[in-house]
Amino acid sequence: MSRYRGPRVKIIRRLGALPGLTNKIPQLKSGYTNQSVSNKKISQYRIRLEEKQKLRFHYGITERQLLKYVRIARGAKGSTGQISLQSSEMRLDNIIFRLGIAPTIPGARQLVNHRHILVNNNIVNIPSYRCKPQDFITIKNSQKSQTIITKNIELSQKYQIPNHLTFNSLEKKGLVNQILDRESIGLKINELLVVEYYSRQA
């Protein structure tokens, strides 16, 4: 399944706030009832499905990528759900978003694809690149790249950078300090439901 490219407001009306997808918070019309909180009995499958969809749409990853992260997490020591989240959070496009270099993860992905981003002084144009502790993120030394990033940083100054990252706004340089902990995840989600959804597939 490919990435979603349809109306973003429609998605967050159904699933709730997804800051990685869009910074918009729609005002629900009077009398509007979110399907997920309607009086109808909701199946456990649907609950798990919607939690999985939150993860997919927030991080902008494909079904195949998410399933891959769950499979890797199952083979690692520790909580499968938490390790799956860490895999998504440590993607380069998400790191750029969390540093405030891009307003959304799709915006961050575009910066990477257009070769505006360097990791450890090397251009990386793979959004799914997995960042590691002590990786430093910088901007390509071109007028176009610097102009785009400066504008993005000015717009995102109101957002707090999580503890596992450091960003020097003057040098436009970010640093990955460590693998993030569960409390630093930038999304309200029950990752155990995602693991349960994939229990027959992963």
Swiss-Prot record:
Domain of life of the native organism: Eukaryota
Segments forming domain S4 RNA-binding: 90-158
SS bond list: none
Keywords annotated in UniProt: Chloroplast, Plastid, Ribonucleoprotein, Ribosomal protein, RNA-binding, rRNA-binding
One Pfam family from the record: Ribosomal_S4
GO CC term (a single one): small ribosomal subunit
Location(s) in or outside the cell: Plastid, Chloroplast
SMART domains: Ribosomal_S4, S4
Any one GO molecular function term: rRNA binding
InterPro entries reported in the protein's UniProt record: Ribosomal_uS4 (IPR022801), Ribosomal_uS4_bac-type (IPR005709), Ribosomal_uS4_N (IPR001912), S4_RNA-bd (IPR002942), S4_RNA-bd_sf (IPR036986)
UniProt cross-references to CDD domains, sorted A to Z: S4 (cd00165)
Entry's Gene Ontology BP terms: ribosomal small subunit biogenesis; translation
Gene3D superfamilies associated with the record: Ribosomal Protein S4 Delta 41, Chain A, domain 1, RNA-binding S4 domain
Predominant localisation class: plastid
Quaternary structure note: Part of the 30S ribosomal subunit. Contacts protein S5. The interaction surface between S4 and S5 is involved in control of translational fidelity.
Cross-referenced PANTHER family: 30S 40S RIBOSOMAL PROTEIN, SMALL RIBOSOMAL SUBUNIT PROTEIN US4M
Protein family: Belongs to the universal ribosomal protein uS4 family.
Function: One of the primary rRNA binding proteins, it binds directly to 16S rRNA where it nucleates assembly of the body of the 30S subunit.
Protein's name in the database: Small ribosomal subunit protein uS4c
Species in which this protein is naturally found: Marchantia romanica
Gene: rps4
